[in-house]
Amino acid sequence: MIAAYFLAALALVPAPRKGVETGGTTTNAAVTFRFDGSLPKEGYRLKVTDAGAEIAYADGAGKLYARVTLDQLKNPDGATAKAEIEDYPAYPWRGWLIDVGRHFLPKENIFDVLDLMVLHKMNVLHWHLTEDEGWRLPTARHPDLVRYGSQRRYDEPGMDGGRWRRVREWVGDTRRYTYGPHCYSREDIAEVLAYAKARHIRVLPEFDVPGHSRAFIAAYPHLGCEGLGFETNRVCRAKGMKSAQICIGNDEAVQTVLSVFDEMLEMFPGVDLVHIGGDEADTKAWAQCPKCRARMKKEGIADVRALQTWFTRKVIAHLAAKGVRAIGWGEIVQDPGVDPKDVVVMPWLHPDPGQKALGRYCPYPWEVAERGYDVVAASHRFEYWGWPHCRDDEYQPHPKSAYYFPVSLEDTYLYEFDRGWKPSMKGRILGTEGYSWSDNRTAWNFFDFMYSAFPRTCAVAEIAWSNPKPRCYADFHKRMQTHLKRLRAMGVPCAPLDPPGSARADSRQSP
């Protein structure tokens, strides 16, 4: 039984795995530290008495997390609750994806994200740097990627609908509105890496290929498949541009991709894992492209879908030669041919009947692990912050479509991403992430970013750190009432625990 049932009154989030409230408080602020090699990685032991706080830690991360818990034990009057806690993570991967490709976040905002990750004992910042709608990775070798890919026009058809209301209010005639240029510098990246390292957070950079490449192709149109009709040197804002594929049959395109990865590794020194994307690539473009068909004939590839596997293996081998392991979305292992030892997989499409009916690859995480792959769970049904908090969320309007559905705090907390795992798969499940996608947003600033992420990110943090079994949402909800006040006192925009229209909103007052 985890500590939430012992320490509910202390409102610790994420809940410690073991602990007991011993009663009373102390004003003694003395803290002593000692290393304890018997504790699990990232673990700590905390004892608060009248003599102050005693902290034993396994490593630097454990020492940091002990201080985080100690801070949460403090009352507004400065006194600290007496308690004994032993704590360590259930999973080594506790991540948060930030999509800066669609909507840019300056480095100062990323520092804020990293601070909030420490507060919730999260340790992987997944930095989604390239997209159809924007290129944010600096590059000296391919300057047009920044010159043309870092800005876009709001000019696609149908933009006078409700989704564009707030942008029109802010900038007037959006048909003349240019977003950007926005791109990080090498110095920005170095600062983010240093800030993350000091907080024991891994930074995972992502260059998403071969799909989601409109910004790439806008810079270098000849590297896209033939006959797609893309306008040269222009990026616009349109969701789901699945025909924006890099031409896998073009040797120059493939070499340019590898060159970008090389430059990325220079900017992320010491990185041992790089995200290569691989999701939502539209095979229709390749099937119609003479160069791609020629590649298939040359390599003996019978199925156009297997063309992506050929490309994926080439990228993986290139990174492996430099001592870097690849990680990618679920589609990269849809077909056989990618060795499990070479890659980590993020199966992101939740296996519901609608997705299966479309013929999309949507396995359960355990099904991918059963094939021998290391897995990070990434459910679009329970962990995507692009979806609204509730069906009638006025602040996060969405088109009336079956594809758009609310993801409540309770949905996220009750998600058992390790369900179906067998003892033989032990060690292959690395953890899970929350995903701040911004493709379903017309306008986006840091308030929007935080409002969409909280309080749901708190649920991801707890299920990845504590992985309580069984889940007790009532207990989590009770602790979150206090924790939400903490976050708001820090200036973090948060949606209500029980938004209007949710099942709980009718029976309780939302903080």
PLM segments and residue spans:
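Sec-dependent N-terminal signal peptides
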Residues: 2-9
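Flexible loop/turn segments at secondary-structure boundaries
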Residues: 6, 104-106, 132-138, 210-216, ...
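Contiguous, structured surface segment used for ligand recognition
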Residues: 9-93, 448, 463-497
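Feature activates predominantly on carbohydrate-active enzymes
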Residues: 21, 41-273, 314, 318, ...
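Hydrophobic alpha-helical scaffolding
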Residues: 60, 182, 236, 246-254, ...
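Generic recognition of stable, solvent-exposed alpha-helical segments in well-folded globular domains
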Residues: 109-112, 184-191, 252-259, 306-314, ...
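Active-site neighborhood of glycoside hydrolase catalytic domains
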Residues: 218-222, 234-344, 349-372
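Flexible, acidic glycine-rich loops studded with aromatic residues
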Residues: 326-331, 336-511
